[in-house]
Amino acid sequence: MNLNLKTVIKTINKFKPLKFRQEVIHQSKYLKIINDSKSTTLSSTVPFLESNEKIIWILGGLFKKGDKFNLNKKYFKNLEAYIYGKDRQVFLKLFKNKIKVNLSKDLRNTLKLIPNLKDIRTKVTVLFSPSAASFDQYKNFEERGRQFNMLIKRYLPIE
């Protein structure tokens, strides 16, 4: 097979990632914002949390019974959870005495709780990885993902 490397690279660069699946919606020197609205379990989120950088984790919705939170303790200090939705108390019990937690009834109010990120000088990732089903407040994960993107622009001005 005879392939032109430039053509292959050009073709690969044309691919667009699927919406709301580990989608980086903002990246600057100190701040990265990821929309992973597709995530509906804790186990699908844990690999993202294994970082030495500060992570602001936004999650919530309908907890899937039997799901486990298996994150190594060494990452707890870098993690702060902002939990919304119907089963926020279920998540609170899972995380109690492990990570710092903030509770809110919905995504809009959750984003209002997050401190201003405009002047940060250390690396921070805002990770929207709900780790739960969306049906308590949204029709599906796509609607939830679109709502997150819209609310980020409104409540976390970053430019």
Predicted regions and their residues:
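Short beta-strands and strand-loop turn motifs
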Residues: 126-131
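C-terminal helical cap/extension that packs against the catalytic core
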Residues: 65-124
